[in-house]
Amino acid sequence: GQGAGLLMIIGGFVMSFVVRATAESSKGILAVFVFAGLMGGGLGPTLSAYLMIYSNGAAILAQALGVTGLIFLSLSGYALTTGKNFNFLGGFLATGMMVMLVAMIANIFLQIPAMSLAISGAVIMLMSGFILYDTSRIVNGGERNYIMATISLYLSIFNLFIHLLNLIGALTGRD
């Protein structure tokens, strides 16, 4: 259930440090697979909840997945075809993530639904920026380690999907 999903997400968080520590070795590949498996497994209970709670849960999941794919392909395609360097976004994105983490922690205690939606909207924009930034770094040679490149893009896509799911569910979900 939800407890197992939370443990898997926590395990994925721990594995993200293992991935960084092993990124320069062949063990890093195994660490990436374990990390992705834990994060995906942790996502399972959330997806199940959407299917059970909302009568249109399958449509919400499909929309979130489709929009995630569209955003990723559009932004990565733009960075690939133009070759533009988006390194200038780095400081803004890092600061934005720190602000969002503080806001998320605050909302755990405050439990304000509108704040949750605002956070999701901001995280969607931030993850879009990270996709541009990370793809640009890969294309322009700023990120030469394919393991770290994989993790960076995976986390951007994962978080983009989660927050699109939250936003679409709140706006179109029917009980």
Question: Whereabouts are the PLM-identified features?
Answer:
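A hydrophobic alpha-helical transmembrane-helix feature that marks the membrane cores
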Residues: 1-175
